[in-house]
């Protein structure tokens, strides 16, 4: 168990450092937003491009993984949506936000740093494929349904199109596309450009964790504990269980990729979740869910890592 804590403890200590630095006033919430934009628009895209472009194409394109992760995530989304919509009698917008929250992980800020310690350079491939599913399937689905709940005059086709148009402005997606193209064509950056991109990629992990902690400052859970507890349970337990089931059902992929899928699904929800909720006046609910899920994930991820470490295939995939 100490080996597991040696993986998770540095991650959450880094998150705590960001929280304390922001809470004490050393940095402001506005500073965290600037750092966050740097990670999302420069550091993370650079890391994703390197992870894909430096490998053979057959090593980075895994249709079975994409399909398995997408199915597991959509199933989780559907269950979360149904529970809030029909079980808790919530409106369409909040139900859609709940579905998105329980099925879309914080892959870049928390997932990648953990995977990097376990799988090494292979972590980037699993994360890039997961980000494709999240950004092309789960987030557009959630945003479209949430917008539909407040824009009865607009057709769902218009809402979906608007969501995809917003996605075209995300540098991460272009980095993934560029990485796939370079890998497929066998292209390589010049040494000067490679070193430049790599400098940005190396800044990703520490700043991402620091920002994740700083973003938690000011979030409140008062009066919403029951709702967000269900969110945490679905995100940290149901999502990895369904993704793991789909990965096992499809099979035919490297064990390290299966481990990456289960671990990424077990991460807390994405850091921009409260921002997405703010567009619909639900930032309080989304922020509370993010806070509780992030804190609880230290224990759930540590337990999951311990369980996976007992499986013989884990030692083969991780070399440990």
Regions found by a protein language model. Give the residues of each.
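Alpha-helical transmembrane segments of multi-pass small-molecule/ion transporters
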Residues: 1-320
């Amino acid at each position: 168990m100490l080996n597991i804590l040696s993986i998770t403890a540095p991650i959450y200590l880094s998150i705590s450092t960001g929280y304390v630095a922001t809470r004490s006033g050393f940095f402001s919430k506005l500073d965290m937003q600037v750092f966050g934009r740097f990670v999302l628009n420069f550091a993370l895209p650079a890391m994703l491009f390197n992870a894909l472009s430096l490998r053979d194409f057959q090593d980075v394109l895994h249709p079975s993984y994409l399909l398995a992760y997408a199915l597991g995530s959509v199933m989780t989304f559907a269950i979360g949506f149904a529970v809030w919509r029909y079980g808790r009698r919530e409106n369409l917008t909040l139900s859609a936000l709940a579905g998105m929250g329980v099925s879309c992980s914080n892959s870049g800020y928390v997932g990648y740093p953990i995977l990097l310690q376990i799988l090494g350079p292979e972590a980037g491939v699993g994360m890039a494929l997961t980000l494709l599913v999240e950004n092309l399937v789960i987030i557009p689905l959630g945003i479209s349904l949430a917008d539909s709940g407040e824009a009865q005059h607009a057709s769902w086709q218009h809402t979906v199109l608007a969501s995809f148009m917003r996605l075209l402005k995300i540098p991460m997606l272009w980095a993934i596309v560029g990485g796939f193209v370079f890998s497929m064509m066998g292209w390589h950056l010049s040494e000067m450009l490679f070193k430049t991109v790599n400098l940005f990629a190396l800044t990703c992990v520490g700043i991402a964790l620091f920002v994740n902690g700083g973003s938690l400052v000011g979030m409140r859970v008062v009066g919403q504990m029951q709702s967000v507890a269900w969110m945490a349970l679905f995100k940290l337990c149901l999502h990895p269980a369904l993704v793991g089931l789909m990965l096992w059902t499809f099979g035919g992929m490297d064990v390290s990729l299966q481990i990456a899928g289960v671990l990424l699904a077990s991460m807390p929800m994405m850091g921009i979740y409260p921002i997405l909720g703010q567009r619909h006046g639900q930032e309080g609910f989304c922020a509370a869910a993010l806070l509780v899920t992030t804190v609880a994930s230290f224990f759930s991820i540590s337990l999951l890592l311990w369980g996976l470490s007992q499986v013989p295939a884990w030692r083969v995939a991780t070399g440990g």
